[in-house]
Amino acid sequence: MSNGATAQVLTAADVIRLLDLKPHPEGGHFRETFRDTRLVEDNRAASTAIHFLLARGERSHWHRIDAVEMWHWHAGAPLELEISQNEGRIECITLGNDLASGQRPQAVVPAHAWQAAQTLGDWTLCGCTVAPGFEFKHFELAPQGWSP
């Protein structure tokens, strides 16, 4: 039985291969792991979930969606998550397992808020849960270099 320590010896490429992750348009790699069969307005899944990995040098570029997104830290280095609800003030949350230093295992991005993220080490594996479910037609990627 593993105690989780082996996760630190894996490389980003190992995790991408083991979880069958694919490149994401915002940056990083992902794979959808859950799509609720319950449907809500517009024939949309009630919720969805993905694995999401950012490696050193990758960034989840500024983007927003029309639904609430919950980030869950799973493994690797801490992750810096930036959120802007008013295109000016940026809130920075560090996701990770060092609770005493202020890191948190999860964070919520409100619907329509801008968000961006980057790993603070070699790689970070997170989960993202979206409700109502994620649809690319409700995804807006900011121009490269843009910041609120």
Identify the meaning behind each predicted range.
Residues 2-108, 116-117, 121-124, 128-148:
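Non-catalytic, conserved peripheral segments adjacent to functional cores
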